[in-house]
């Protein structure tokens, strides 16, 4: 496969993100990561829900699916199961993925389906004028709120680990190269992967600004004693506990980097193939013919009756 440069993953679609938006850094990291991994655009799918972050598929020259609010992971699940050979990456905001879409977020972790999720975490609903998202802490009042937030915050790292994700990381949108390296590792990981990407919202969030993060963030990999990788099943509980404890750090010091990796767990598509002989990762449903050469369906009326014979009820007139 010929090597592709970063420019080949860019589109000519104009971005209407606010100047200074953290989404620009995430987009740049994705394009650079795709180029360094030399991903085939025809075999790569970027999926999103609704929100500022969910415009991302329009700006990357791969297959893009811009779906409905909170359902990006649900669509990505269908895409991956239909063709496990694809690289599938989900982009969504903290409101999109951890609010209305949180059930799908948890389900993806439980399944350990080989999909990568990027959470654009700016702690507000930017597209709808700055309401508090699930990651804004109780008592905090960003400039778009008339009163302080009444609800406690979701910790994306802790939730991901509890849900079963086997690659869990946090990054910062303005540290583009650091995010790029984490994203490459997440895409190469076999299993469900999530990156909680902290980012400023210059329009509505006057608390979590670039200035706020500048002197607080530190990289986990700078600590030589930090080892998030599970190399034996007996280590799993200890690694998870350490990751959750580290994820609770917030305030004067905020860790970014890889919190937890378990490469030992089989994926959902592998388990599905073992249980269902008709499901094949090498010959997935998306690549199987749905009609004969003459255009007629492979499963005609006679075959249909044979397959579903035990479900057919013959009703006799009295």
From Swiss-Prot:
Q: How does activity depend on temperature?
A: Optimum temperature is 105 degrees Celsius.
Q: Cite the binding residues for [4Fe-4S] cluster.
A: 18, 21, 52, 201
Site annotation Plays an important role in the binding of CoA: residues:
129
Residues noted as binding thiamine diphosphate in the record, renumbered to the chain:
50-53, 69, 95-96, 126-127
Co-factor note (free text): Binds 1 [4Fe-4S] cluster per subunit. Binds 1 thiamine pyrophosphate per subunit.
UniProt note: pH dependence: Optimum pH is 8.
Q: Which InterPro entries match?
A: 2-oxoacid:Fd_oxidored_beta (IPR053399), 2-oxoacid:Fd_oxidoreductase (IPR051457), OFOB (IPR011896), PFO_beta_C (IPR032686), THDP-binding (IPR029061), TPP_enzyme_TPP-bd (IPR011766)
Q: What are this entry's molecular-function GO terms?
A: 2-oxobutyrate synthase activity; 4 iron, 4 sulfur cluster binding; magnesium ion binding; pyruvate synthase activity; thiamine pyrophosphate binding
Task: Write out the catalysed reaction.
Answer: a 2-oxocarboxylate + 2 oxidized [2Fe-2S]-[ferredoxin] + CoA = an acyl-CoA + 2 reduced [2Fe-2S]-[ferredoxin] + CO2 + H(+)
Q: Which cofactor does it need?
A: [4Fe-4S] cluster; thiamine diphosphate; Mg(2+)
Q: What class of enzyme is it?
A: oxidoreductase
Q: Which Pfam families match?
A: PFO_beta_C (PF12367), TPP_enzyme_C (PF02775)
- Keywords for this protein: Iron, Iron-sulfur, Magnesium, Metal-binding, Oxidoreductase, Thiamine pyrophosphate
- Residues that coordinate or bind Mg(2+): 94, 122, 124
EC numbers? 1.2.7.11
Q: Name the CDD domains for this protein.
A: TPP_OGFOR (cd03375)
Main function: Catalyzes the coenzyme A-dependent oxidative decarboxylation of different 2-oxoacids such as pyruvate, 2-oxobutyrate and glyoxylate to form their CoA derivatives.
Q: Which PANTHER family match?
A: 2-OXOGLUTARATE OXIDOREDUCTASE SUBUNIT KORB-RELATED, PYRUVATE FERREDOXIN_FLAVODOXIN OXIDOREDUCTASE, BETA SUBUNIT
Per UniProt, subunit arrangement is:
Heterodimer composed of an alpha and a beta subunit.
Q: Which named protein is this? A: 2-oxoacid:ferredoxin oxidoreductase 1, subunit beta
Record organism: Aeropyrum pernix (strain ATCC 700893 / DSM 11879 / JCM 9820 / NBRC 100138 / K1)
